[in-house]
Design a protein with these regions (language model features):
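Conserved phosphate-binding elements of NTP-dependent enzyme cores
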Residues: 1-957
Length: 957
C-alpha cells in the first residue's frame, strides 16, 4: 500500500501546478496566509477527488440521486483513501434538530428506554407491570407458609343478561362460589330471593363481588405450586386477563393483570417511537414536538427576573388599576408559604407554578379564575371585545414553552417511563458532563444489562468523545441551529470518532475555532486518537499548538492570492527546530521562498505588544446579565478602546455579547430591534454611541455574481467613469451598461456570467467558456469603451493592488479611496471581479471590515467582531490589528470575542468569563488590562497569557 498520498499538477483556484507528498496515517497540518490556497488543496483538490472517486464507483442508477462532482484540476492523485470533510459550518437550520439527535445519542436513549424502561403510574407512582401466571404464583409464595388465601376473578356486569341469568350460566359451567367483601357466598344462595339478588347485584356494581375459584394455603411444594398455577390460569381466563388474591385474616386484596394497566389506566407499551418528538406517536399533540407554542411569553411578562413579586416582577400587574391583581396574589400567597420578597430567578418550580397557574384557595371567588398570571390573561380573553384588552394580550404574546409537555416535546405517556428513576426528558436537560457521570453510576439488573449492554457502550463512548472535544457543557436538548460554527464542527468530529471508521482521510477546517487554549490540548488528543486507529488526518489550521503537535506541516504561500499557491515548506516541525536552531531566517530546503509560518514558529517574526494601553473614562454597563448560564453579572464595556471578551468554551461570551449586549444597544438605538437576552439594566454613556455593527464571518454574498468591489461600493464609481468616456456618451451608454447584472451591456448568451453550464446526465455539469463573449461577460460594443487603454473587463481582471496603482496614476481619487481599505486589510491580492463565493470565511470578514473602514462615518460607532482571527495566519492577524487601530483612531469603539492570545495581549481591556464552561461558568473572572490579568493570575486565560506576555517583555528588553 502507498505510504504517501501523491498530488501532482494541482491547479485548482490559485494553486500553481504544485506537487506534494502527504504521509498516510499521520496527523498533517496545512497552513499558510489567508487566501494562499490551503482550502484549495485540502477541500477543492483532496476531498473533491476522494468524493468523486467514491461516487464514480457507484452504479449509474445510484449516481443520478447524488450530487454530481466536478473533477478537480489536477494531473493525478495516487494513494488517496476515501475522504470525509468536517467543515466549520452550522450544519442544521432545522428547528427540530438537537445536539442529542445530531450526535445520535438521543436515538440510543430512545432504544434504551423502549427496552429496559419501567413504566410508573402517575396516580399511585407504582410500577406498571404486565403479569403472567408465574408472576402471580411468585407473589403468593412471598407470604408466610400456611397463610390462607383465595384465588378470585373479577366479575363484570353484562348488558345482555340479568344478574340471575349470569349466575345460572356460570353454574352450568361448573362454577359455584362468589366472594363478597371477603365472605364466601354460594351462587344459588345469591339468587334465591329478591332481597339477596338486590344486595349482591349492588355489590357487583360497586366492584365488591368476585368469582371465587379456589381456597388455598401458601405451600411451596411441587403439588401446592401446581394447584395454585392451575387456579391462577383459570382466574386469568375467566377474568379476561385479571386475577386477584385475597389474604386472610386481614382480607387484603392483591390485583394482577396480564394487560399493561394500573389504577384504572391502560398504559402504552414503550416503543422507540414513543420517545421520538419527530414521530406522531411520541410528539406532544399540542406543540407537535417543537416544545414551543404561541402564547404568553414569560420574558415579556417578567422582563427583570431579579425582582420579587412584591417589588413588581410581574410587568402586567403594575399600575394603579391592574395592581389589584398583585395585591390579591400577595394576600393569598401566605396560604401556600409563597416567598413574596424572593427574586423571581430564585423561586422553585412549585412556587413558579403557583404564580403562573394558581392552586387551591387562589380563586377570586368560587367558580371564578385564579389570582395568577394565567388567570389574569384568561380574564382578558373573556373581555376581548374591549380594544384595550386585545392590545394588552398582543403586548405579552410570543413564543413560550408548551404548557402541556413543559418543553419536553413529548406526549405525557413517554414521561411515565423511567430508567434509573429518570425520564428521557430529565436526561436530555443534563449537561454532557453530568450525563456521563449519571450513566457511570447507573445500576441495572443482570437481565437489563444483557439487553442494554451495546446501547450503554454506544451512549458512553459518544458522551466521552463530546467531553474530549471540549463540549461537556452542552445539554442534549440544545438546538443545533443555536450552536456556533466551531461547536457544530466539533460535534461532527465527535460523531466521526464515535463511528470508528478506519483507513479514511479526514479533512478538518480549523477545528480550534471557538476553543480556548485550555481546550486545544484535548482537541489535539482527539485528533491523534483518530490518527492512531488508522486514519490520515489533514487539518487546515493556524493554531500554534496544533502546528507544533502535528507529524507533518505543509506551508502554502508565500503570500496570498496570485502571489500564493506554492508549497513553501513541507516537513516535520520537530526536525526543523533541531536543524534550524542557528538559522536567522526560515526558508524551505525545497523552495527559496520565505515561510512566514516558520518565521513565526521559530520566533523570527512576531506580533508586538503595544507600547502603551489606551486609557478610557466612558463606558456602557450591562447590569444583572442572567441569560443561559450567566450568573446575574455586571459588566463594563469601555468606549473608544479595544476590548476583548475571552473565556473557556461555553463560559458565556457569545451569550453576553451576541445575545445581550448587541441587541440591548440595538434596542436603545432603535425600538424595533429583536428582544435581547435577560438582563436588568443598560447604563452608562449611551449617548456616546450612535450606531452599532456586528461583524461575523457569514459570506457577503452567495451568488457567483457578488464580488468584493461591489460590496465596498467601488464598482459604482468605476461604472460612472466608463459611462463618462466619449465613445460611451456618443452611444448613449448609461452606467448600468457596464454592469453584468443588468440587461443592456452584458452578454445575453451567458447573462453576464462569462460561462455557460452544459448539463450532463450522469456526470458533473460542464462549465464552458461562453462562445459569444469568450468569457468577457460584456457585448463587444461595451468592451470597445476604454479608459486609458483599459476596458471594463480589463479593469475587473486587475487585482486591488494593480487597480489602486492604475487609478492613482490618473488621479481618480474617489475610486482609490474606495479600494484602499481592501488593501489595508490585506486583500490587495484579490481581483476586482472575483466572485464572493470563492472567498474564505476570514476574507469575507475582512471585506466587511474594509467596507466599514471606507465609510468615513461621522457618527461614533460600536463595532462588535465575533472571532475575527478565524481563518487568519499570524501574518494576517498583525494586518487585522492595524485595521482595528484605524477604526479606533476615528473615534469608534471595538468589542471582540476572541481566544487568540496574540489578540488578547494587544487589547486595552480584557473581560474574562468563566471559570469553566456551562453551569460552572457565567461569572466575571476578571476585567482589566492584560498586564493586570496576568498579575492577578485568576482563570485559565491568565495562565496561558502569562508566558506570552513575559516572552514579549523580555524581547522588548
Amino acid at each position: 500500500m502507498n505510504q504517501y498520498i501523491e498530488v501532482k499538477g494541482a491547479r485548482v483556484n490559485n494553486l500553481k501546478n504544485i506537487e506534494v507528498k502527504i504521509p498516510r496515517n499521520q496527523f498533517i497540518v496545512i497552513t499558510g496566509l489567508s487566501g494562499s490556497g490551503k482550502s484549495s488543496l485540502a477541500f477543492d483538490t483532496l476531498y473533491a477527488e476522494g468524493q468523486r472517486r467514491y461516487v464514480e464507483s457507484l452504479s449509474a442508477y445510484a449516481r443520478q440521486f447524488l450530487g454530481r462532482m466536478n473533477k478537480p484540476e489536477v494531473d493525478y492523485i495516487k494513494g488517496l483513501p476515501p475522504a470525509i470533510a468536517i467543515e466549520q459550518k452550522v450544519t442544521s437550520r432545522n428547528p427540530r434538530s438537537t445536539v442529542g439527535t445530531s450526535t445520535e445519542i438521543y436515538e440510543y436513549l430512545r432504544l434504551l428506554f423502549a427496552r429496559i424502561g419501567r413504566t410508573y403510574s402517575p396516580v399511585s407512582g407504582k410500577e406498571v407491570r404486565r403479569c403472567s401466571a408465574d408472576d402471580v404464583v411468585a407473589a403468593a409464595l412471598q407470604h408466610n407458609p400456611g397463610t390462607r388465601f383465595t384465588v378470585l376473578a373479577p366479575l363484570k356486569e353484562r348488558d345482555d343478561r340479568t344478574f340471575q341469568q349470569q349466575m345460572e350460566v356460570m353454574m352450568q359451567q361448573g362454577l359455584s362460589r362468589l366472594d363478597c367483601d371477603g365472605e364466601m357466598v354460594r351462587m344459588d344462595e345469591a339468587i334465591e330471593s329478591e332481597a339477596s339478588m338486590l344486595r349482591y347485584e349492588t355489590a357487583l356494581r360497586e366492584g365488591r363481588l368476585f368469582l371465587l375459584l379456589d381456597r388455598l394455603a401458601v405451600d411451596a411444594s411441587k403439588d401446592g405450586v401446581s394447584r395454585l398455577t392451575d387456579s391462577v390460569e383459570t382466574a386469568l381466563f375467566e377474568g379476561d386477563g385479571e386475577c386477584l388474591l385475597r389474604f386472610y385474616p386481614e382480607k387484603n386484596l392483591e390485583h394482577f393483570s396480564t394487560r399493561f394497566e394500573a389504577d384504572g389506566i391502560t398504559f402504552e407499551d414503550p416503543s422507540d417511537n414513543l420517545f421520538s418528538f419527530n414521530s406522531p406517536v411520541g410528539a406532544c399533540p399540542r406543540c407537535e414536538g417543537f416544545g414551543k407554542v404561541m402564547g404568553i411569553d414569560e420574558h415579556l411578562v417578567i422582563p427583570n427576573r431579579s425582582l420579587s413579586v412584591f417589588d413588581g416582577a410581574v410587568m402586567c400587574w403594575r399600575g394603579e388599576k391592574l395592581g389589584i391583581w398583585r395585591e390579591e396574589f400577595l394576600r393569598r400567597a401566605q396560604l401556600h408559604n409563597f416567598p413574596i420578597f424572593e427574586p423571581y430567578f430564585n423561586l422553585t418550580e412549585a412556587q413558579r407554578d403557583l404564580l403562573w397557574h394558581g392552586g387551591e384557595g387562589m380563586a377570586w371567588e368560587e367558580g371564578d379564575v385564579d389570582v395568577c398570571i394565567d388567570g389574569f390573561f384568561k380574564a382578558l380573553e373573556m373581555g376581548q371585545y374591549k380594544i384595550q384588552n386585545r392590545v394588552m394580550l398582543a403586548r405579552y404574546r410570543g413564543k413560550t414553552t408548551c404548557p402541556d409537555c413543559r418543553g419536553s416535546r413529548l406526549r405525557p405517556e413517554a414521561l411515565y417511563v423511567k430508567v434509573g428513576g429518570k425520564t428521557i426528558a430529565d436526561l436530555v436537560k443534563m449537561s454532557v458532563k453530568d450525563l456521563a457521570a449519571w450513566f457511570a453510576a447507573l445500576e441495572v439488573t443482570e437481565h437489563e444489562a444483557q439487553i442494554a449492554q451495546r446501547l450503554l457502550s454506544e451512549i458512553n463512548s459518544r458522551l466521552h468523545f463530546l467531553e474530549e472535544v471540549g463540549l461537556n457543557y452542552l445539554t442534549l436538548d440544545r438546538l443545533s441551529n443555536s450552536l456556533s460554527g466551531g461547536e457544530s464542527q466539533r460535534i461532527n468530529l465527535s460523531t466521526s470518532l464515535g463511528s470508528s471508521l478506519v483507513g479514511s482521510l479526514y479533512i478538518l477546517d480549523e477545528p480550534s475555532i471557538g476553543l480556548h487554549s485550555r481546550d486545544t490540548d484535548r482537541l489535539i488528543h482527539v485528533l491523534k486518537e483518530l490518527r492512531d486507529v488508522g486514519n490520515t488526518v489533514v487539518v487546515v489550521e493556524h493554531d500554534e499548538d496544533i502546528m507544533r503537535a502535528a507529524d507533518h506541516i505543509i506551508d502554502i504561500g508565500p503570500e496570498a492570492g496570485r502571489h500564493g499557491g506554492q508549497v513553501v515548506w513541507s516537513g516535520d516541525y520537530r526536525h526543523l527546530v533541531e536543524s534550524r536552531t542557528d538559522n536567522k531566517k526560515a526558508t524551505s530546503s525545497e523552495s527559496p521562498l520565505t515561510s512566514h509560518t516558520l518565521n513565526y514558529l521559530l520566533g523570527r517574526e512576531r506580533i508586538e505588544l503595544p507600547t502603551s494601553r489606551r486609557k478610557w473614562n466612558r463606558k456602557i454597563t450591562i447590569k444583572g446579565a442572567r441569560e443561559n448560564n450567566l450568573k446575574g453579572i455586571d459588566v463594563d464595556f469601555p468606549l473608544n478602546v479595544f476590548t476583548v471578551v475571552t473565556g473557556v468554551s461555553g463560559s458565556g461570551k457569545s451569550t453576553l455579547v451576541r445575545n445581550i449586549f448587541y441587541p440591548a444597544i440595538q434596542r436603545h438605538l432603535d425600538e424595533t430591534a429583536e428582544r435581547p437576552g435577560e438582563f436588568v439594566a443598560l447604563e452608562g454613556d449611551l449617548d456616546a454611541i450612535r450606531a452599532v455593527d456586528f461583524v461575523d464571518q457569514n459570506p457577503i454574498g452567495r451568488s457567483s455574481r457578488s464580488n468584493p468591489v461591489t460590496y465596498v461600493k467601488a464598482y459604482d464609481e468605476i461604472r460612472k467613469l466608463m459611462a463618462e468616456q466619449p465613445l460611451a456618451q456618443q452611444m448613449e451608454m448609461k452606467p448600468a451598461f457596464f454592469s453584468f447584472n443588468a440587461d443592456g451591456g452584458r452578454c445575453e448568451e451567458c447573462k453576464g456570467a462569462g460561462t455557460v453550464k452544459v448539463e450532463m446526465q450522469f456526470m458533473a455539469d460542464l462549465e464552458l467558456e461562453c462562445e459569444t463573449c469568450h468569457g468577457h461577460r460584456f457585448k463587444n460594443e461595451v468592451l470597445e469603451v476604454k479608459f486609458e487603454g483599459k476596458n471594463i473587463y480589463d479593469i475587473l481582471e486587475m487585482t486591488v493592488n494593480q487597480a489602486i496603482e492604475f487609478f492613482d496614476n490618473y488621479g481618480k481619487k474617489k475610486i482609490v479611496n474606495r479600494l484602499r481599505p481592501l488593501q489595508d486589510v490585506g486583500l490587495g491580492y484579490i481581483k476586482l471581479g472575483q466572485s464572493s463565493s470563492t472567498l474564505s470565511g476570514g476574507e469575507n470578514q475582512r471585506v466587511k471590515l474594509a467596507y466599514y473602514l471606507g465609510q468615513e462615518r461621522a457618527v461614533p460607532t460600536l463595532f462588535i467582531f465575533d472571532e475575527p482571527t478565524t481563518g487568519l495566519h499570524f501574518h494576517d492577524i498583525s494586518r487585522l490589528l492595524h485595521a482595528f487601530n484605524a477604526l479606533l483612531e476615528r473615534g469608534h469603539s471595538l468589542v471582540v470575542i476572541e481566544h487568540n492570545l496574540d489578540v488578547v495581549k494587544t487589547a486595552d481591556h480584557v473581560i474574562d468569563l468563566g471559570p469553566e464552561g456551562g453551569a460552572a461558568g457565567g461569572e466575571l473572572v476578571f476585567a482589566g488590562t492584560p498586564e493586570a490579568l496576568v498579575e492577578a493570575g485568576k482563570g485559565y486565560t491568565a495562565h496561558y497569557l502569562a508566558p506570552l506576555m513575559n516572552q514579549n517583555s523580555t524581547q522588548h528588553d
